[in-house]
């Protein structure tokens, strides 16, 4: 039954479960993923780094740590937060394309680019720079860890602003609905290229 008492009870149960299992979202470097990283917590994502899943998982973990964490928990999380971004930036380049996801067995960037057109293939959502800014803020303004990959972050943002932005509205868009996890519906199946909004 949906009532205030049950809501309170189930919220407490959910929070306790999350507090107990939060470090199950942490992953060590493996294969193509050279840095520690975060996953949403499901076994389906064992060694997969996804664009906005890592960002939103990080925000959730930060909230969990604010509510129930220690200074050691905060310090430990930093490597995983940074690693999400650094793993993605390691797949960047001058054209600005960065993949939506990286698996432990993802080929090297040059191999991926032989199979796709980076100008017509979806890439990481525009939240990559936002995620980096979030981590910089959480670490007291330290951005030195971004130095090596910063060019790739700049070209990534530039690609969205120059090639994936609707001129009339200024809204950023995806090239298509591939890997956006939008259910296949009449609204997506016949959508024109370059018209899906992130």
Give the role of each language-model region.
Residues 1-49, 83, 87:
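Low-complexity, Ser/Thr/Pro/Gly-enriched N-terminal "stalk/linker" regions
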Residues 1-3, 56-76, 127-143:
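Well-ordered alpha-helical scaffold segments within catalytic/enzyme domains
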Residues 2-12, 28-30, 95, 99, ...:
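Catalytic cores of carbohydrate-active enzymes
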Residues 6-17, 70-89, 142-161:
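Extended, well-ordered alpha-helical scaffold segments
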Residues 21, 25, 91-98, 105:
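A short secondary-structure junction motif
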Residues 43-48, 100-129, 133-145, 161-198:
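The feature captures the catalytic groove of carbohydrate-active enzymes
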Residues 47, 51-95:
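Alpha-helical support elements that line or immediately flank enzyme active sites
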Residues 48-59, 76, 119-127, 148, ...:
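Aromatic- and histidine-enriched alpha-helix N-cap/loop-to-helix transition segments
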């Amino acid at each position: 039954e949906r009532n205030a008492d049950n809501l309170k009870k189930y919220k407490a149960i959910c929070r306790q479960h999350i507090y107990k299992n939060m470090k199950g979202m942490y992953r060590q470097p493996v294969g193509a993923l050279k840095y520690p990283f975060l996953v949403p917590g499901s076994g389906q994502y064992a060694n997969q780094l996804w664009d906005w899943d890592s960002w939103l998982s990080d925000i959730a973990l930060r909230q969990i740590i604010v509510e129930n964490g220690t200074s050691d928990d905060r310090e430990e999380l930093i490597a995983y937060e940074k690693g999400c971004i650094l793993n993605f930036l390691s797949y960047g380049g001058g054209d600005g394309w960065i993949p939506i996801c990286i698996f432990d067995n993802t080929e090297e960037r040059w191999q991926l680019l032989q199979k796709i057109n980076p100008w017509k293939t979806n890439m990481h959502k525009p939240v990559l720079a936002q995620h980096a800014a979030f981590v910089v803020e959480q670490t007291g303004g330290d951005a030195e860890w971004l130095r090596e990959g910063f060019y790739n972050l700049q070209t990534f943002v530039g690609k969205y602003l120059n090639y994936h932005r609707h001129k009339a509205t200024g809204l950023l868009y995806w090239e298509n609905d591939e890997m956006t996890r939008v259910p296949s519906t009449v609204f997506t199946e016949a959508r024109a290229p370059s018209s899906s909004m992130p």
